[in-house]
A protein has these predicted regions:
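Primarily extracytoplasmic ectodomains and periplasmic/lumenal surface modules that are beta-strand-rich
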Residues: 36-39, 47-49
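Long protein-protein interaction modules used by eukaryotic assembly/scaffold proteins
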Residues: 2-7, 32
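Activation segment
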Residues: 50-51, 171, 252
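Serine endopeptidase catalytic core focused on the charge-relay Asp
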Residues: 10-17, 25-26, 33-35, 56-178, ...
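Compact nucleic-acid interaction/catalytic patches
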Residues: 48-58
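Cytochrome P450 catalytic-core helices
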Residues: 42
Length: 260
């Protein structure tokens, strides 16, 4: 009997960031398709090793900046869910980096797109998240969402944990007033870079306030999780930031490759 794996669980990629062979951090990424090209999406702070607000190194002990990314991708020609390790060089000795940043806000949008080469694309079974779901679902404050990531690493399967949360700020303020939506959820560092989806069952409301009924779930990708808001005490507020999904196409179309 074949395993029933949710298609959204196949969109994510557990990643390890390293400087040569020195481990720096673990995080989450996911795949995206645009103009017949494939990209890996994650946070700027993951690949740079620096805080986007202060530009300080996140690792206070080593001040290391990643130059390699190791990810577990779905492999072509294997059973669904079988993962294949791939190493991507994300920074050259010259300082040139592989990732694209937002053309206007740059690192102030904590999201990057890493173009994936043809040799990698030929061996990977891609499940780009922007080719799934229903873009017309209504998104409002108080609704439940799921953060799909790896708080404890890839585990035995390489499939993500679905961490439940709720939208804690007005989503319509993005991007006019705020650059991100707040979500109420407890998370761990390995969740940085996770896709966040809205999922409703059976009865669904569209942006035009029309009600539809289906026998299963409807889904909408709403953005990229980048961790909790900084507070003096990590227990003070379990509030995280989700950068709007609309930024991803802007990053790819802008084609701005940041110098490290």
């Amino acid at each position: 009997m074949p395993l029933a794996i949710d298609e959204f669980s196949l969109t994510t990629v557990p990643i390890d960031l390293r400087f040569n062979e020195q481990p720096i951090s673990s995080a989450t990424a996911f795949t995206w398709e645009r103009h017949d090209m494939h990209f890996l999406i994650t946070n700027w702070h993951n690949v740079s090793g620096r805080d986007p607000n202060t530009d300080e190194h996140i690792s206070k002990t080593t001040a290391a900046e990643p130059n390699m990314l190791s990810g577990l991708f779905n492999k072509k020609g294997t059973t669904l869910g079988h993962k294949h390790p791939v190493v991507i060089h994300i920074r050259q000795d010259s300082g040139e980096v592989a990732w694209l940043v937002h053309p206007t806000h740059k690192r102030k949008i904590d999201v990057v797109a890493i173009p994936l080469g043809s040799e990698l694309v030929s061996s990977i079974r891609f499940c780009p998240i922007n080719k799934m779901g229903s873009s017309d679902l209504l998104v409002k404050i108080g609704m439940d969402v799921f953060v799909l990531g790896y708080p404890f690493g890839p585990g035995k399967t390489g499939l993500p944990v679905w961490k439940k949360g709720s939208i804690a700020s007005e989503p319509d303020l993005v991007p006019h007033v705020e650059k991100y939506v707040l979500v109420d959820t407890a998370s761990r560092p390995g969740m940085s870079g996770s896709p966040v989806i809205l999922r409703t069952y059976f009865i669904h409301v569209t942006q035009e306030n029309e009600i539809t009924a289906t026998p299963g779930a409807a889904n909408k990708f709403i953005g990229v999780y980048s961790g909790r808001l900084h507070t003096q005490d990590p227990l003070e507020a379990q509030i995280g930031m989700v950068w709007s999904a609309t930024y991803i196409d802007e990053i790819i179309d802008g084609g701005l490759r940041e110098h490290g």
